[in-house]
């Protein structure tokens, strides 16, 4: 990460796409997409997804590292070209506990990430815990971030410390996505970004972390990009110019969250304006969902009724029976809920792919379609971009490759924006 940031600060148009997903097909796609390039791939896990207690994936940081490395070995992607990152590392998962208990868990969380070889660490202690004022004072946020940084430094080996980099600050909304419709978004004021940096510098120095400050490579701000279930707020470069100019006088770049669904031109403009780390998650699993839904429609027409997977019906049944991952985000009417379950840009379906019933139905569908020749006309109907690539000889009409290429479409836009 440090080399890439140095190149950007030296005036080169270069950025990196941060892949925030634990889905094996998304990780496979991210690695396969850059297999034949010289670029490194940044893959990040969030604190609620992967932590010392397993998170919602059931994986510890060490488990996630091995999970990613196993996929890399399968794809033929060199492990040393993977940068592992930890996102929103702090009390996010334990906000219902008092600050002392939540920070104790957060300290162990950060230590486990660093021990497992994660080298990009987002120190985010911005969340109020039980009994805390809302919002927290910037000084409190910075002091807690310094505690987390001290924890990281305390377990890092000399070799790890050379690679270790920190990201500070946070965006609005909190991690997890918008829970309601958005019409506009608050762009971070330069004064607030400067205050975030100033308070963190003061807190780090007070804890004897002066050297660690040199490892702070980025600050998270809101550049004016966001999405909810059916709306996308697109980047307006002119609105972010004060931020773009301010960061030029620092050693850092910006990290932009929720950049999903922006245009490829917007990604290029974001990187030009020093938002050099672009995080993406739901857009990748949304593309995966689109591909699976398209293949399910093809299966419906090609496979005998008694042999069909019933994939779409299974997904719907499971999500309606177990609504905990979408209930507080989606609309309440039955028809509206179904539309959001299927098509929301926030893609809460991503939490359900590991469910045994859904996983088995998708596997059945894939086996069914691997056993037949899919007519080109059907691919044109349901996956038109992939049809064009089949026609030009770039792609084969194999279900797995069709899914990969659908995810590549998202990665292609980021590659354009981050181009070396």
Curated annotation (Swiss-Prot):
Pathway: Carbohydrate metabolism; D-tagatose 6-phosphate degradation; D-glyceraldehyde 3-phosphate and glycerone phosphate from D-tagatose 6-phosphate: step 2/2. Disulfide bonds: none annotated. Induction: Constitutively expressed. Keywords: Galactitol metabolism. It comes from the Bacteria. InterPro entries: Aldolase_TIM (IPR013785), GatZ/KbaZ-like (IPR012062), GatZ_KbaZ_carbometab (IPR050303), TagBP_ald_GatZ (IPR023436). Coiled coil: none annotated. GO terms for cellular component: catalytic complex; plasma membrane. One of its GO terms (molecular function) is enzyme activator activity. NCBIfam families: agaZ_gatZ, PRK15052.1. Forms a complex with GatY. Component of the tagatose-1,6-bisphosphate aldolase GatYZ that is required for full activity and stability of the Y subunit. Could have a chaperone-like function for the proper and stable folding of GatY. When expressed alone, GatZ does not show any aldolase activity. Is involved in the catabolism of galactitol. HAMAP family: Tagatose_aldol_GatZ (MF_01296). This is D-tagatose-1,6-bisphosphate aldolase subunit GatZ. The gene is gatZ.
């Amino acid at each position: 990460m440090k080399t890439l940031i140095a190149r950007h600060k030296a005036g080169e148009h270069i950025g990196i796409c941060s892949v925030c997903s634990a889905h094996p097909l998304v990780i496979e796609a991210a690695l396969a997409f850059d297999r034949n390039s010289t670029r490194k791939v940044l893959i990040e896990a969030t604190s609620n997804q992967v932590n010392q207690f397993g998170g919602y994936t059931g994986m510890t940081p060490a488990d996630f590292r091995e999970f990613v490395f196993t996929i890399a070995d399968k794809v033929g992607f060199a492990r040393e070209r993977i940068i592992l990152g930890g996102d929103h590392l702090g009390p996010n998962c334990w906000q219902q506990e008092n600050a002392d208990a939540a920070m104790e868990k957060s300290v162990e969380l950060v230590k486990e990430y660093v021990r497992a070889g994660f080298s990009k660490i987002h120190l985010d202690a911005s969340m109020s815990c039980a009994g805390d004022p809302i919002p927290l004072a910037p000084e409190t946020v910075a002091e807690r971030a310094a505690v987390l940084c001290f924890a990281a430094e305390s377990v890092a080996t000399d070799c790890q410390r050379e690679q270790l980099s920190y990201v500070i600050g946070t965006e609005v909304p909190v991690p997890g996505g918008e829970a309601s419709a958005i019409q506009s978004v608050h762009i971070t004021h330069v004064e607030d970004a400067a205050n975030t940096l100033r308070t963190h510098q003061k807190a780090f120095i007070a804890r004897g972390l002066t050297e660690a400050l040199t490892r702070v490579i980025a600050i998270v701000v809101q550049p004016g990009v966001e999405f909810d279930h059916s709306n996308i707020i697109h980047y307006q470069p002119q609105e972010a110019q004060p931020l773009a100019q301010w960061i030029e006088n620092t050693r850092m770049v910006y990290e932009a969250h929720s950049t999903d669904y922006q245009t490829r031109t917007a990604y290029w403009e974001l990187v030009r304006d020093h938002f050099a780390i672009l995080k993406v998650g739901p857009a990748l699993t949304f593309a995966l969902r689109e591909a699976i839904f398209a293949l399910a429609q093809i299966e419906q027409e090609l496979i005998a009724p008694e042999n069909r997977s019933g994939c779409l019906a299974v997904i719907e049944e499971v999500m309606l029976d177990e609504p905990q991952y979408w209930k507080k985000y989606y609309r309440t009417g039955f028809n509206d809920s179904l539309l959001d379950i299927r098509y929301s840009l926030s893609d809460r379906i991503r939490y359900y792919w590991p469910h045994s019933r859904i996983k088995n139905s998708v596997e059945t569908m894939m086996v069914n379609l691997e056993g037949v020749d899919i007519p080109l006309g059907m691919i044109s109907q349901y996956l038109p971009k992939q049809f064009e690539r089949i026609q030009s000889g770039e792609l084969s009409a194999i279900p797995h490759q069709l899914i990969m290429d659908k995810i590549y479409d998202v990665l292609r836009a980021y590659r354009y924006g981050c181009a070396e």
